[in-house]
Swiss-Prot record:
Subcellular location per the Swiss-Prot or TrEMBL entry: Cell membrane
Annotated membrane topology: Single-pass type I membrane protein
Domain Protein kinase: 200-460
Transmembrane region(s): 140-160
PROSITE patterns: PROTEIN_KINASE_DOM
GO cellular component, one term: plasma membrane
Top-level taxon in the UniProt lineage: Eukaryota
Entry-linked InterPro entries: Kinase-like_dom_sf, Prot_kinase_dom, Ser-Thr/Tyr_kinase_cat_dom
Protein name: Inactive receptor-like serine/threonine-protein kinase At2g40270
GO molecular function: ATP binding; protein kinase activity
Length: 489
């Protein structure tokens, strides 16, 4: 929602800027028009003044200035006539005078007309002033082009951010050249038909879990996935409370995002046929429980066990430092999966508030005797797992020492850990007793007296010298490769 609001504000600001550009363009055009009009008016005034001066000089040169003056002979005749008889009417002026004047002034008229002809450089009154039409083109093109480009950018950002929080579908199984964590912007919704094809029509069953059956799937790219399918097959058996747990589980798993965690990659929900499925990263080397307690499984040496312990510690420390902290709900050796290079992948297939009841209904065989609800419970479970990895003995709890083995009670009473080491281990570190002290601090009866996972991780790193990078899977099937997801329209 926040992305949409930001995009909308950016879009409004862009429109406002575009309107300002258009207004600026109109003002610039009006200014150019007024400038051309002013030039034209000034030119017209100059031409008018020039023509007036030209007319005045022309009239002055054409007129004979001596036309009205009497000649000497006329003055003499007038004197004689005045002395003899007064004339009743004045005699007209002799024609030769005006003729002479006309004769004299005609060349002057022609000469004056030729002399005052306007110069070629002077602007003519009737010739229009050419307008500089090219001066406004760059301004208009720049404003329109820039506004159009920014409009495209804003539109693209709006549609991109509006889809950022949505789930995506369908799921293309190809690989791209760059890592992308699909759970960063939302867990994708996958089609049942795609999962069905990857799991060979759900025939490749690899086990069971509190959710239901666990399948192995292989994408067209060769990437392997783990598919956990809920046992419920009808909508009437799927309660509203169960749906709430389902969505909370997806939300919780999507926040973990750690290299030593079996991350959630997608989920499927369909009405016909009724389907609820979770898709996880797959670790091909089975569980820690199998390697510790089944002779047929690959033997884990001392270095491999320490690496598994450190990967688990780093993952739990990451989960506990989230806001709010996330505690693993079923932290046992059967929930720790191993990759090709025997790095740990912490899986969490538990579901609902009562996992024991879920397991009974689904006839599953996974260990669910511990249901941790807070980080302090995870610290206790981590201490039990450390003891199990070193001794090879399965211990349920300090409160149930007779259920499997009493060695844990003996250890807590002062027995050295070196005397309890798994007999299949050919060698082990001399600092094993230091690890024993860490185990004892994790198994304190009062949860408030137990150390934090951050403190435990720091102690073990100092003892083993293994960094987070040392405990990270080197060939993680989906961490270094990306599942390319196409968003729906």
């Amino acid at each position: 929602m926040l992305f949409k609001m930001r995009s909308f504000v950016a879009f409004v600001l862009l429109l406002s800027w575009f309107g300002s550009c258009c207004s600026l363009k109109d003002q610039a055009v009006d200014f150019l028009k007024s400038e051309d009009s002013l030039k034209k008016d000034l030119s017209s005034d100059e031409d008018s003044t020039y023509l007036k001066a030209f007319g005045f000089h022309r009239k002055t040169l054409v007129r004979n200035p001596y036309k009205d003056l009497p000649s000497r002979k006329d003055r003499k005749n007038r004197v004689v006539a005045a002395t003899t008889t007064p004339s009743s009417s004045p005699e007209p002026a002799p024609k030769h005078v005006s003729t002479k004047a006309s004769t004299v002034s005609e060349p002057q008229k022609r000469s004056s007309t030729q002399d005052v002809s306007p110069s070629p450089s002077a602007p003519l009154a009737n010739s229009p002033i050419p307008r500089n039409s090219h001066s406004s083109v760059p301004l208009v093109v720049g404003c329109v082009g820039g506004a159009f480009f920014l409009l495209l950018v804003a539109t693209g950002l709006y549609f991109f951010t509006s889809k950022a929080g949505k789930t995506v579908n369908p799921w293309r199984t190809g690989l791209s050249g760059q890592l992308q964590k699909v759970f960063v912007t939302g867990i994708p919704v996958l089609k049942r038909s795609e999962i069905e094809a990857a799991c060979e029509d759900f025939s490749n069953v690899i086990g069971s879990c509190p959710i239901g059956k666990l399948f192995k799937g292989t994408l067209s790219s060769g990437v392997e996935i783990a598919v956990a399918s809920f046992a419920t097959t009808t909508a009437k058996d799927w309660k509203d409370s169960t749906e709430i747990h389902f969505r909370k589980k997806i939300e919780m798993l999507s926040k973990i995002n750690h290299k030593n965690f079996a991350n959630l990659l997608g989920y499927c929900e369909e009405k016909e046929p009724f389907t609820r499925i979770l898709i996880f990263e797959y670790a091909p080397n089975g569980s820690l429980f199998e390697h510790l307690h089944y002779k047929e499984s690959e033997h884990l040496d001392w270095g491999m066990r320490l690496r598994i312990a450190m990967g688990l510690a780093y993952c739990l420390d990451h989960m506990h430092q989230l806001n709010p902290p996330i505690a693993h709900t079923n932290l046992v050796s059967s929930s720790l999966q191993l990759t090709e290079d025997y790095a740990v992948k912490v899986s969490d297939f538990s579901f609902g508030s009562s996992e024991t009841e879920t397991n009974i209904n689904n006839n599953t065989v996974i260990d669910t005797h511990i249901s941790a609800l807070n980080p302090e419970d995870n610290i206790y479970s981590f201490g039990l797992l450390l003891f199990e990895m070193i001794t090879g003995k399965l211990i349920e709890s300090v409160n149930k020492p007779d259920s499997v083995d009493s060695s844990l009670v003996d250890f807590l009473r002062g027995e050295t850990l070196a005397k309890m080491v798994d007999p299949t281990l050919e060698s082990y570190d001399a600092k094993i007793e230091n690890i024993g002290e860490v185990i004892k601090s994790c198994l304190r009866t009062d949860p408030k007296e137990r150390p934090t996972m951050q403190e435990v991780t720091g102690w073990l790193r100092e003892i083993t010298g293994l960094s987070p990078n040392d405990a990270t899977p080197k060939l993680s099937p989906l961490w270094w490769a990306e599942l390319e997801v196409l968003s729906t329209a």
